[in-house]
Amino acid sequence: MSTCSLKPPDSRDSDVLIVGAGPTGLVLALWLTRLGVRVRIIDKTSEPGTTSRALAVQARTLEFYQQIGLADAVVERGRKVIAANLWVRGDKSARAVFGELGEGISPFPYALVFPQDEHEKLLIQRLAQLGVTIERDTELVSFEETADRVLARIKLPDGTTVASEAAYIAGCDGAHSTVRQALNIGFPGGIYTHLFYVADVQGSGPAMNGDLHVALDRADFLAVFPLKGEGRVRLVGTVRDEAARERDKLEWNDVSKTVMESMRVKVERVNWFSTYRVHHRVADRFRHGRAFLLGDAAHIHSPVGGQGMNTGIGDAVNLAWKFASVLHGRADASLLDTFEPERIAFARRLVATTDQAFTAVTSPTLTARLIRLDFVPALFPLLFKFKQARRYLFRTVSQTLVNYRGSSLSEGRAGSVHGGDRLPWVKITTSGTDRDNFEPLTSLDWQVHLYGQATSDLQTFCSQRNLSLHVFRWSPEMGRSGLQENAVYLVRPDGYVALADPTDSAAAVASYLEGHGLTLTK
């Protein structure tokens, strides 16, 4: 790796050099910019992708977007999924109405489809409004670390190589991450034998009615996702390796018969078609010194469940506020040590779970076929008749169930809310106006929530520490969500509870802040 002459800290090109301008890198740049951190974001491609694979935007991602004023635009451009249908042997065998699956759990209680290519365009537009431009055709060549910065060499579009300095580098550069490879971090796992394909099509038929449709009758998987616009859908499917190997390159005509037979889809126009291989891997580490790995650079897995892009965005939000806290002198650098343990545990569970799910829906064994053809179609609609089953499914898929209870940053319990849990969402009606307890989270800062009445000691303490205190009049709905009356909840900038203390104690909050080296007055 190359060396560069040192400059004073204020002469760094950026605080954070972001390598990769997919959703993960773009969201990291958005959050950091909103938090007052200087970013430089580069990408070796000449333009954003146009044949995207990711489709689902989960509720937790929308909650993160709500914090930066982006959620409404995503919901407006996306399409809510009202119901899901299972097909067996060319006929619809089961239908389950989603409705407001997560009612009372999230301000976004539904499944949303918003293609990644359109998603990226929106993120890029928002960054441009904040004065941040993605540097295209710009590639990371190498980098090295000193005691207080990262020294990188970057190849510009004209082929020249220049030096760039930043406090930290974030590898958001995908499965073939240059950052990860430069750090010699292992990426263990495997590759699925199936070849995946995705197609943007215009058509008609019973599977083009705005619902989600999934065919289970073959070892080859097929799903139809509704998009904005009449008769426009995104097809995602697989072809077993032995079939794919018979052709040098898979084309639409090779799978069109399967699509028509599985769901009676009449395709009138194919806007685009592409194929890809899917790996299931998790990096051995998500951090080395001043370098961090996020998104596909850190973990890749089957697209079953629509979790991949959302997990990368979760990585970005988790790291963004920690970068900002350290760079602004409001936290010790050890705060960054919590990124890897908080995110790698979830990534490992997710890869294992999606691997099992994908194997179940594509296995050619007799047992797997019996489960797909008989058991799942019978059970699927029944599950949605039970409120608890619906709520658990929503919490799991929406990532609102993700927690950091095992983190060194998480302490205490009040009600059923533990330190490390996502702050429960509660709707609050005041003077006939519907509000919620997530509104204060738009400050992107530490804050204290109290549901009931705050003591004068707590009010004085929060005022002296420049710590926002939000007091909500107690209601039975708060208790049902797991909150405890008059308990203190210290909430992180990303909406997770750091400390849950049942005693309404300013001393408990003071002890937490001191113990974790947090200074909120700078």
Question: How does the language model describe each region?
Answer:
Residues 125, 132, 168, 172-278:
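Conserved FAD-binding catalytic core of PHBH/FMO-like flavoproteins
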Residues 2-15, 19, 35, 44, ...:
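Helical substrate-recognition/capping region of FAD-dependent monooxygenase/halogenase enzymes
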Residues 136-150:
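A conserved short coil-to-beta-strand element within the FAD-binding core of flavoproteins
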